[in-house]
């Protein structure tokens, strides 16, 4: 464990602060390609699209098409092999890593909850969040009913891995945790896959009405989940097979 903790990250932080505002798109991929170390082929090839502040970008494709890889390049979990990923017109490689990541909310495919209480889990998003802010996030994530049904509500126990919650409940709680931070850029990586269609639709409606109007990257294998996005990126084996609205792509 000590060796792991002492290992230095190969990800070098940039020096620039994230601009408070810019006329440039909130998010832009500019001819981005990515190849994993020792891989024989690119996982992503020549991906280009942009999202204005407050827009929702849908990303769809089959298993192994590169959706999660695309998501991981935005907060610099990996760096693009070629091309640029830009936030507010600035290459993410030039930005201070902490400043970049504190403005991004990422909800991965596998919902992860920690041992403790629901309140403690949600406050990983923002340590000083008020109970009112927690309930606001829960309502937006369609998780307030889940918490109200638990004895103790916000003080209800969360077992290791969230095993005392269903898959759909864990997903909604992890989305709520991301919303507590009020991120300016929200990445949902197939993180509503366990939700029924009605709850998924209610979640998307709530996200569109968030008062701080985040830019949303919504990754899904369900057409119904992304059909109302402002733009849809269609991935096929790491290549961009389409870009446009649902109507344009039909």
Report residues per predicted region:
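Cytosolic ends of transmembrane helices, especially the final helix of ABC transmembrane type-1 domains
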Residues: 1-4
């Amino acid at each position: 464990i000590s060796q792991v903790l002492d290992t230095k990250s190969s990800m070098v932080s940039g020096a620039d602060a994230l601009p408070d505002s810019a006329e440039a798109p909130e998010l832009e991929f500019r001819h981005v390609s990515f190849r994993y170390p020792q891989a024989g082929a690119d996982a992503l090839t020549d991906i280009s699209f942009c999202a204005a502040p407050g827009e929702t970008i849908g990303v769809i494709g089959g298993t192994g098409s590169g959706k999660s890889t695309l998501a991981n390049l935005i907060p610099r979990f990996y760096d693009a092999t070629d091309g640029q990923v830009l936030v507010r017109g600035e290459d993410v490689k030039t930005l201070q890593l902490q400043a970049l990541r504190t403005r991004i909310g990422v909800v991965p495919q596998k919902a992860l909850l920690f041992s403790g209480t629901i309140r403690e889990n949600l406050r990983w998003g923002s340590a000083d969040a008020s109970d009112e802010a927690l309930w606001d996030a829960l309502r937006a994530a369609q998780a307030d009913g889940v918490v109200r049904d638990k004895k103790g509500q916000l003080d209800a126990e969360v077992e290791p891995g969230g095993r005392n919650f269903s898959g759909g409940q864990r997903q909604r709680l992890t989305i709520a945790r991301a919303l507590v931070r009020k991120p300016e850029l929200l990445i949902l990586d197939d993180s509503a896959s366990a939700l029924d269609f009605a709850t998924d639709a209610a979640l998307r409606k709530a996200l569109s009405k968030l008062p701080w109007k985040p830019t949303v990257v919504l990754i899904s294998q369900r057409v119904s989940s992304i059909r109302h996005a402002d733009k849809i990126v269609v991935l096929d084996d790491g290549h961009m097979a389409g870009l446009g609205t649902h109507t344009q792509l039909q």
